[in-house]
Amino acid sequence: MVKCRDILQMNLDGMWLLAGEGGLDRVVSWSYVVMTRPFADHMNAGDFALCSVDFEHFGWKEVSDAMYELDELKISGFAISIKDEREEVPVDIIDLAEKLTLPLFQIRWEKASFVDIAQSIGNYVIEAVSYTHLTLPTKLEV
C-alpha cells in the first residue's frame, strides 16, 4: 500500500512538500491531473491530484475551492505547479492544507513534467500492488 509519505520519499525531481504533513499516511491509489469539474466525475478516493496554477484559468481562489472539493472526495494528496513561479503560495492555502491535513506539494514550473511525475507515481503504485500480490500467501491444497 502506497502512502503520500512514500511519494515524498521518492524525491521526485522538482517536487517538494509545502504543508499537510499530518496527512502523509493517506493511501495513494493513482495520480490524476486536475482539469475539469466536477471532480467527482473523474476522480476516486486515493487519487493523487496534480494541478497547474496558470492564473488565467486557475488561480488561488480555484486552488482553495479545489482543495475543499478534492478533500471531500478523499484524495491522497494535492500537488500544484505555479506558472513561472511568480508568486509564493499564499499563507491561507498553506493553512488550509494544514487544517484539512491534506498533503500539499509544489512542483517546479520549469523543467518538471506533470507527465513524468504522474507516471512515476503510477508506476510506483503498480509495483507496490504487484509486489503485494506476489508476496501474499497462497492457498495450500490438502
Where are these regions (language model features)?
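Alpha-helical/coil-rich non-catalytic "connector" segments in signaling and regulatory proteins
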Residues: 1-136, 141
